[in-house]
A protein has these predicted regions:
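Single conserved hydrophobic/aromatic residue that forms the stacking wall/gate
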Residues: 1-6, 11
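Glycine/small-residue-rich pyrophosphate-binding loop that anchors the diphosphate of NDP-sugar donors
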Residues: 20
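Conserved C-terminal structural/oligomerization subdomain of aldehyde/semialdehyde dehydrogenase
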Residues: 91-232
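Short, well-ordered alpha-helical segments in soluble proteins
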Residues: 8, 40-44, 202
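NAD(P)-dependent aldehyde/semialdehyde dehydrogenase
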Residues: 26-136, 142
């Protein structure tokens, strides 16, 4: 899919809201991989390492980290698409890798590189359980689904933001707050939300001298019924 290959793999090493992994049901695994491979060829050609559309990994340290993850997956026969790598060019072609559970090293950190782990789960309910078992994500993406399924995702998960049928685009809408929840951060900014977050809301109370509550001071003669009425 163009939105996954283009919008995700092109900027995966430069944004904190690129998908960390992809969850698909068994029936969609093969057609999705076929579509992603076609999109990759369309964008980067048959020799992606020499494409002028493919950027470099930012430095050698990050390249070494990604190379180690990639070669470990290659040794296990888990590369589904891509896997091309050039140390001289400091480039890694967009690569899709099979993972079998959340304990895989590829699922343990933000990759910041063109490696996309794919996890096959039976259905949406199982996928939502998997999401809830991990830290609350900064961004959550859902492709497809009817209105009921979309509402199920929105109401049973907690994340900084959600984008339906696309990735990353929510960060470009200034009217939408951007921020995390829990492990992914607290608070939000952009537009009015940014003004509120970075402003101090000072509380001010002014009371007149001519009226006071004598119940505040000793000797206390508390009428519980009166207090209950005052408390509503």
């Amino acid at each position: 899919d163009n939105r996954l290959v283009g919008s995700e793999m092109c900027i995966r090493d430069r944004t904190c809201i690129a998908p960390d992994h992809l969850v698909v049901p068994p029936a969609l695994r093969s057609p999705l991989l076929k579509a992603m491979e076609e999109a990759r060829t369309e964008m980067y050609g048959s020799d992606p390492l020499n494409s002028n559309q493919l950027g470099q990994i930012i430095n050698e340290r990050q390249f070494n980290r990604l190379e180690q993850l990639l070669e470990s997956a290659r040794a296990d026969g888990r590369i589904l698409i891509g896997g091309e790598i050039s140390r001289e060019q400091r480039r890694i072609a967009p690569t899709v890798i099979r993972v079998d559970d959340r304990n895989d090293p590829l699922m343990a950190e933000e990759l910041f590189g063109p490696l996309l782990p794919v996890l096959v789960l039976d259905d949406l309910t199982t996928a939502l359980q998997e999401i809830r078992q991990g830290p609350k994500p900064l961004a959550l993406y859902l492709f497809g689904g009817d209105e009921a399924q979309q509402q199920q995702v929105l109401t049973t998960t907690s994340s900084g933001g959600v984008c339906l049928n696309d990735v990353v685009m929510q960060a470009g809408v200034p009217q939408l707050p951007f921020g995390g929840v829990g492990a992914s951060g607290m608070g939000s900014y952009h537009g009015q939300s940014g003004f509120d977050t970075f402003s101090h809301h000072k509380a001010v109370l002014k009371r007149p001298f001519r009226f006071d509550f004598k119940l505040r001071y000793p000797p206390y003669q508390v009428d519980l019924n009166l207090l209950k009425r005052l408390a509503g």
